[in-house]
Amino acid sequence: MQVLSEGEQTAAGLAGFLTEVYFDESKSAVIFDDPMSSLDHQRRSNAAARIVELAQDRQVIVFTHDLIFLTELVKHANYADVSILEQTIQRNVTKQPGMILDEFPWKAKDVKKRTGDLREDLARIKKQQDSLSVDAYEIMTSDWAGRLSETWERMIRSEVIYRIVDRSTTEVKPKLVRILAQITDDDYQDFDASYSAVSTWARRHDKSEEFSYVAPDPEEMEYELNRLAEWYARIKGYANNS
């Protein structure tokens, strides 16, 4: 007798349910509560694709705390042109549950979403600039720069490393190694200069009294944001050509 692992049991149960739903002609809404366990590394992508396929002709609601699975859902939904309504249920700062936000949390957002958020936040900083004290302005620009720095890091992982090595299965995709061959020295210099600049702006370490630090102006911030967006477009192009 063979005993199924927890992940295999979850996958088998989900497969049975999806088969049953497939033959249901009512097209009623389907709700999944954390359909993938942490053990289902090799099945996440297949399950996400099947759930998205189901969502093409009925409402599908998915509750999950698995960010990798969420990423797979979004990826397959984009491929299939299936619209997504983003919502996050979380606790407030006093640990009371039930706060609902009409977007994914920052750590779950992809590079494109983060870039859009950073552009909106920069517009607010520009608008408030003249009414802020030096310290208040430095705090706002430091937080913004920290998130831009994180977006660079996310881009390197998601658009370079994870395209070559599947993080859920650790499978290496040899053909996509071509992405690395297309990255030029200019690309590296662009990344290094921008990442170094925004890391300096971010409040990660105490600024020495001997170092006369001046927070970046909005034009400098916009330049670095545009540099990231252009780098992202180039690296996506490399991936599409591989």
Give the label of every model feature segment.
Residues 26-34:
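Catalytic Walker B motif of ABC-type/P-loop ATPase nucleotide-binding domains
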Residues 201-242:
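Charge-enriched, short contiguous segments at helix-coil
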Residues 1-16, 37-39:
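Conserved ABC ATPase signature
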Residues 1-3, 19, 23-26:
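Extended helical coiled-coil dimerization/tether regions that scaffold
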